[in-house]
Amino acid sequence: MTVKPAKAASLARNLAKRRRTYLGGAAGRSQEPEVPCAAVLPGKPGDRNCPEFPPPDRTLGCWATDAAPAAGLCGAGSEPSIAPTSCAGNLPSRPPPLLSPLLASRNPCPWHYLHLSGSHNTLAPTCFKAKLHRKRGSQPPDMASALTDRTSRAPSTYTYTSRPRALPCQRSRYRDSLTQPDEEPMHYGNIMYDRRVIRGNTYALQTGPLLGRPDSLELQRQREARKRALARKQAQEQLRPQTPEPVEGRKHVDVQTELYLEEIADRIIEVDMECQTDAFLDRPPTPLFIPAKTGKDVATQILEGELFDFDLEVKPVLEVLVGKTIEQSLLEVMEEEELANLRASQREYEELRNSERAEVQRLEEQERRHREEKERRKKQQWEIMHKHNETSQKIAARAFAQRYLADLLPSVFGSLRDSGYFYDPIERDIEIGFLPWLMNEVEKTMEYSMVGRTVLDMLIREVVEKRLCMYEHGEDTHQSPEPEDEPGGPGAMTESLEASEFLEQSMSQTRELLLDGGYLQRTTYDRRSSQERKFMEERELLGQDEETAMRKSLGEEELS
């Protein structure tokens, strides 16, 4: 069976256009949409290595490596191709580390695998340049491509019999202007830190809520928050004190000042160090700036009359200069005349303006005087009207008060007179001046009399008590008579002399008390009243007994 080369090339182009890119390896198809491939594989003649169209003159082989198939290693048939998806010792979604990625493709090359132990599930690669292969659209020869380890085999495989189709994608068809700008950079993530990749024991799978589409407002708020945080961080970095910039001719260099090897000890070693910098050197004088020479000095000798004839060529120039000078002088004269006319007109205008300004000022002053006179007369008229109204109100109030008080005054004056607000001056003088003095004098006289009575009562009481004692003593002496106690004896004479001396002493004390005004003033009224009450009570108790005792004592004294 032979096929034309043109037909084989067209089939290769169509198959290349329908090619899909698989990024998942042995895990199956990727989630990327179908993309037509613009690049077309270079056309191969029909007699090159191709599994669909073997060359007539030689056996099938690999067109990528020009290697012949292994003897007795390939099989015939047209069964559906099977891609190896698992092998012992590795995860189902990861190919063996020593095999090429082409082994996990959908249509592996049949010329680079050999059967092991005659089974459809055991194939081994025989070509180390399988990455040069491209996926073909035709069916390879009948074989099962499965990889196994030396110790174990894969129990099952995955087959793909459905036609290629675009898988549903969770991305939106059109870009959202709010959440994703036009030129948003593509973010790349590390699959080792992706939360969607399950690690460890799949039996203890953590099931959580699916991540829904984020809200546009929330994304905008997060973006604004990040911008504010970045701006705040930049402001803090600007405000942070930094090392000043180096002077001209110098630069800052990071220098390791600590020891590279530090000894770890129980006690920290303390060392005192000092550093003295050199004194500041005097600034050298600034050299004068001398610019560099940029041109070249060239000398040229020109003889007289060599370039031009001065007398001949100066005439037109001189005519032009003289004409321009005369024209300029005429223009200056005209300008001066024009300026003089302008100054004259300005002077006339100034005079007219000054006269009009004086007239305006006179009229303004006249208007001001008229306005002030008007305001003054209005104020005077208002004051006159105000005074007239106030006077009329006062007259009306006075008439009303007189008419109202005509009957009220007599009764008010009578009540005030009865209350004592209207008084006789003579009577008032007697009440204020004479009666208080009279009461004071009477009170003094009464005090003197009360003091005299009190003193007299005290003297009488003392005499009576003494006579009573003497009388009682005399009765005792009568019961036991002795010659010296007779009535006419010396004892009686002694008692009479003592009594007379006591009476004289009491009388002298009474006179001194009466003459002593300071004593009367020092004695309070309460003390006098208490003493007076006391003496009156004692006097009432004694009564007639005291009088009789006093009479007896006086009689005995007279008899003696």
From Swiss-Prot:
One of its GO terms (cellular component) is 9+2 motile cilium. It comes from the Eukaryota. It is found in: Cytoplasm, Cytoskeleton, Cilium axoneme; Cytoplasm, Cytoskeleton, Flagellum axoneme. The modification Phosphothreonine is found at residue 286. Pfam families: Radial_spoke_3 (PF06098). Residues 153-162 have a biased composition (Polar residues). Belongs to the flagellar radial spoke RSP3 family. PANTHER family: FLAGELLAR RADIAL SPOKE PROTEIN 3 (PTHR21648), RADIAL SPOKE HEAD PROTEIN 3 HOMOLOG (PTHR21648:SF0). Component of the axonemal radial spoke 1 (RS1) and 2 (RS2) complexes, at least composed of spoke head proteins RSPH1, RSPH3, RSPH9 and the cilia-specific component RSPH4A or sperm-specific component RSPH6A, spoke stalk proteins RSPH14, DNAJB13, DYDC1, ROPN1L and NME5, and the RS1 complex-specific anchor protein IQUB. Interacts with IQUB. Interacts with phosphorylated MAPK1. Interacts with MEK1. Interacts with PKA regulatory subunits PRKAR1A and PRKAR1B. Interacts with RSPH1. Interacts with RSPH4A. Interacts with RSPH6A. Interacts with RSPH9. Interacts with LRRC23. Functions as part of axonemal radial spoke complexes that play an important part in the motility of sperm and cilia. Functions as a protein kinase A-anchoring protein that scaffolds the cAMP-dependent protein kinase holoenzyme. May serve as a point of convergence for MAPK and PKA signaling in cilia. This is Radial spoke head protein 3 homolog.
